[in-house]
């Protein structure tokens, strides 16, 4: 044979098996793929190690007759969940969670096979013994959200330690993991790891962010659980509350393993190169004090043990029984008898929702991270109620009002006796300091959110809930009561003069509305009328009427307050409180100055710091300048048409007042919130006393503020002349205001207002009703109800315009609808003022993660303008369109974003986890009801 023919023959011999293998893989993948599904997961509540979230993953059919789908535990989730599976032919089925392992990263969903009309998936066979080093594998899954991706690899390890995802997160233990370099990523969780025959040899569970390594769960315990579910039996899981770690022999010898024990185990388990060693003993367990870290496990009930599957097999079949545990410690053999605990009793299966807070029993998963006994109530989500008290996520509640809280039932029973607005003392530990308990005062508040308990029902695949009974009525003197106090002398005459007129203000929002992203605020309030209990604040302290306001007097007495008035145009608001509740506390109205402040004037900045101390700082006025903040990305309130005082090295750590040496207030030292790109910031500036007086006058008059609905910006006379302003008007403006040679130029017109199509950007304002105006204050003073005549300079000539002002009340928000996890209300002025958006439709202010709004992208900042093709102009229209829709039904929503781009989405209702309710503001405050 010639050399060429020889080479070709060798090449064919090499390529032929490769081609055959490729063909085998192609056939296998074609056969397996129809049984792999993409799973859309909506974890409706934060629970245990998981947050509420909308995400995606993978699963695969393991029993086509029963509709069982295998995936990861963290995909089934330990808490309330809704999920759907999408087959490769794009058929969609509803899933019900039927099992999640207490420790290992696997679980099962169930679907109704009869609901499939076109797909005919076959069950994939689990083959635990097929996981061997060197096995070529393929991972089929929804990798990176691509519905179906196929990733190749070769099993490199079958005895890898379980991956560690960090403290406070879900972590598997007491099992080996498989490892290969297949570069799986988000969305591929729950993917089948198959061999060339199509058998499943592992379950994809996680991967390394810094390498191509992927980690797969072995299937021995999975196969057992599946068999029990198929036979209708409970999946028993036992534990000693001990975490073992597989340790090689070289390290075991240093721990004191005897030569005889090593010889015996090497002979019994020739494939193993190590044994199991105690790595953690859970405090409070029976094993605590009997087993120690470093103990080498040699036998269980007399049977030698060297790996996790054998250990689990014995424990899972011995729940409730006692077993003999044999270990070696420092070369000495020891034996202890321990009861096998049911793992399900260490996994929470019920929750309490109260004030947006989610609470449940502490799990072994989280107790491990804290090194605490599995006892107490875990804060899965601090929500509105506990955030106000400073209790964080991950905290464990141990006592309530001095009563021990061992389990959720204890807490539910204790809270049932707490009236609305009453304070209770909660003792808890934080995850970063589990050995250092803390105590916080929590104020009971059930007006904003549903209050209910929910318990998992695996047979139904749901979490049925029961509303808590109404709280008892507070007895006189229990809630919201105050006594009298006095104001101590500070030793500073200015602070002493102002102390009786300044209060600490705390404001907490239960929902994000009006484009406001932060929910908890602290600041300084000014008592402007002690007889009526009237307190002035800035809108960066009280940004809306939807929330809870409380005032603290003399750092001693705390009173509830009500939002009385929100200035519709400027950064000011008014609160009211009951003066009678202060007894004879010598609170007095602040003394407002007459002269105001000018550049170079000295002033005392006085206010409360974050720690409650009243402080003062002598400063000087640097300038009086117009505000010029960027438009809000979230469509929140933004100050405009106002000149503010800027200080030389003004305070940045408190707000309050600017006063003269006698204690007369000449300005409010306010903080202004603004958004610069994606960054939210705030800056301190002074609001002149003249503007404060006009606010109080408007409130006392009828509470209505008239607005031309035009945003003005000062321009110099030189700039105006470049725009064609003639000499006559230049002289007239100079004579009208010799020290302020400028005009107001129209920059924006509020969409939907009478000024649209009349006033145009670039118009120079000359006069209103014949009176020359060139400042914001003059323009506002001239804007009264009724048709106004504006004289403007446009395109080189005078133009007379007729504009009807718009009257705005101080009620910024009266209704909020919580629907499908979205917070909805009528469009607000900031949208129209900043972005030129017509105030029609329904504004999406916020959406909750894990909700239908999150899943179907009903995103914040959009407006809903149609429901199923029918127009909606306001919240009433929307509520009428969605009323009486059955749970699980779908509807079409037309959305419009901030720049007018339309979008059509579909949304499926989930009334069980996300019931609709309406928040309404009445004479007695806000109340919640079904719409």
Where are these regions (language model features)?
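Active-site region of chymotrypsin-like
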Residues: 35, 41, 52, 112-124, ...
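Short consensus segments that form the blades of beta-propeller domains
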Residues: 48-51, 146, 314, 514-517
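C-terminal recognition in membrane/secretory proteostasis and scaffolding
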Residues: 27, 65, 73, 96-97, ...
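A short, Trp-centered hydrophobic/proline-enriched beta-strand micro-motif
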Residues: 31-45, 139, 497-512, 603-605
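Boundary at the C-terminal end of the N-terminal hydrophobic targeting segment
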Residues: 20-23
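Short glycine/Trp-rich loop-beta-loop segment that forms part of the substrate-binding cleft
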Residues: 68, 91, 125-156, 552, ...
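Short glycine/acidic-enriched loop and turn motifs that connect beta-strands
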Residues: 44-45, 76-77, 144-146, 542-543, ...
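Bacterial N-terminal signal peptides
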Residues: 7-18
